[in-house]
């Protein structure tokens, strides 16, 4: 029996999940979990990338302690951030987080030189200041000139483990530097940044064999001899693979630190309507596209908890929230002011004050405000998606950590007026494992993998119901007018 390890690292935590296929059912075991985050160093918010590597080795040592001497391994992480590699293969600096303030106004500055419509027609990717395109636009020239290669975070981890440099496509597409039609890094865009296309590794599809873990790591650490497979390395791409969807006319919501809501399509949509609504066409696994919108997610609730010194669990916060009427206060969760404020609680209160609403005071009111606002945003985006794609959405599959928040799932079902299916919460790791198993011939296809997922995990169901959607939508429109 083959053993598979998913290295799944998000913006706030990481984990190593051991998986195996037994009687057409996936069995999972969490081997190691660790915190992730950025710290302010050398003038920027930076990821502790060396510490992440140590956590991976700790997890792999735990796998070996289970008596597993060989395994298959795949890596997925958050997107857009990168590591600059020098001529000798060394890391030139710790990677800067997408939440760093260095890209403020970068979209405006670059698009004043290079029209938005032109960039969108080329890439089909939404405009966000965190995109790699704008990070590289403001990167130190000295570092860029010294860099031989630019590797996104999961590709860097794969490189450290195996010595092989690649640019996996699902994650590379989020950079806003891939040409949608040519399916290559866009030389024209890169030349505008004065970056040679050769600084990027060869594009590689999800499901491609990468290589064996280097012998030096087997000597330094007591870890299994692993074959590394390049999975869908963008965590959302893996989460979509791990979505237990069936049939047609469904949408997905990967709910975690970020909310990514969209549809899986076989062809991109980069027309005027998609451009106007800032929709993105990220590449998916096995020739698909993730037509989606990036929305702020549980980050806001996580920050409320942090400001409260974690006195309440997230379950307790949701319970407190249920004691208050929904939609008493509504915030625009995608307002840039909620991206990384010094104090999230104060920012929410100030927003409500500025928009003529009552100010939430308790932890329950604040949580209620955020969950209600997120559900409203989801429903509005599903409406827009239907208009742009011409496809009727009948079901929404919520996966990731947010699938455990029953209140948010139920509010979304009511506002959107469609059935909502929630779970599995570890869809990203599951999608990572499924791609590995397809590579190894244990699962036939992504469709077959999704059937196995449905048979392996409990999926929650939330029915739609009557709610004053149009009235709430009108109130939200008035709130936006204050901005």
From Swiss-Prot:
User: What EC number(s) has UniProt assigned to this enzyme?
Assistant: 2.7.1.5
Q: Name one GO biological process term.
A: rhamnose catabolic process
Alphabetically list the UniProt keywords: ATP-binding, Disulfide bond, Kinase, Magnesium, Nucleotide-binding, Rhamnose metabolism, Transferase
- What's an example GO cellular component term for this entry? cytosol
Q: Which annotated residues bind ATP?
A: 11-15, 257, 302, 401
Query: Between which residues do disulfide bridges form?
Result: 352-369
Q: Where does substrate bind?
A: 79, 234-236, 294
Question: Which pathway does this chain act in?
Answer: Carbohydrate degradation; L-rhamnose degradation; glycerone phosphate from L-rhamnose: step 2/3
Example GO molecular function term? glycerol kinase activity
Q: Which InterPro entries match?
A: ATPase_NBD (IPR043129), FGGY_C (IPR018485), FGGY_N (IPR018484), Rhamnulokinase (IPR013449)
CDD domains (UniProt xref) = ASKHA_NBD_FGGY_RhaB-like (cd07771)
| Reaction equations catalysed | L-rhamnulose + ATP = L-rhamnulose 1-phosphate + ADP + H(+)
Q: Where is the active site?
A: 235
User: Which coenzymes or cofactors are required?
Assistant: Mg(2+)
Q: Which NCBIfam families match?
A: rhamnulo_kin
Q: What does the UniProt record say this protein does?
A: Involved in the catabolism of L-rhamnose (6-deoxy-L-mannose). Catalyzes the transfer of the gamma-phosphate group from ATP to the 1-hydroxyl group of L-rhamnulose to yield L-rhamnulose 1-phosphate.
Q: Which family does it belong to?
A: Belongs to the rhamnulokinase family.
Name of the protein described by the UniProt record: Rhamnulokinase
State the taxonomy lineage: Bacteria, Bacillati, Bacillota, Bacilli, Bacillales
